[in-house]
């Protein structure tokens, strides 16, 4: 599993990190018995479907120690995985009480409490600026940019996993937003991509 994580994250991964993520997986499986944290159909492939899929995002951080915000973190995917692999502060935004409590308990249990912050709130109420903004399956791209743009500064990187509708979402978003974009192939799903956006700004209305 070390080799798979290193390929996904494009960086060395220690055995201690693998053990931490293994404990995270066990906590996810246990909690999913009472909460719908991840789809039951994906529990058998949780490493490939969720852990490695999240791990690949750290390769897009602009510099070591970058600050991350994971919007709609839910089960801690990708935020907890990013915190395990990266060195910078990670903020998890989750409005649902039970899931926010799961994130708080999990971060503390994994020894990530000093690195990870949980905000139980809707995205619109969150304040601050972050070096990297990420989210999995929260909203179509254009709407998500509108929801989260207040959290970006001029050099913020947006690292957003997308499925087969990535191109159509991007085309729709470009009606209202300007940005530089790279479409990177997912290392876990041949039908998926990671949209990496920079210099995101709203187009002026005419």
Specify the residue positions occupied by each region the protein language model found.
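Gly/Ala-rich phosphate-binding loop of Rossmann-like dinucleotide-binding domains
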Residues: 83-87
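Class I SAM-dependent methyltransferase "Motif I" SAM/SAH-binding loop
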Residues: 72-76
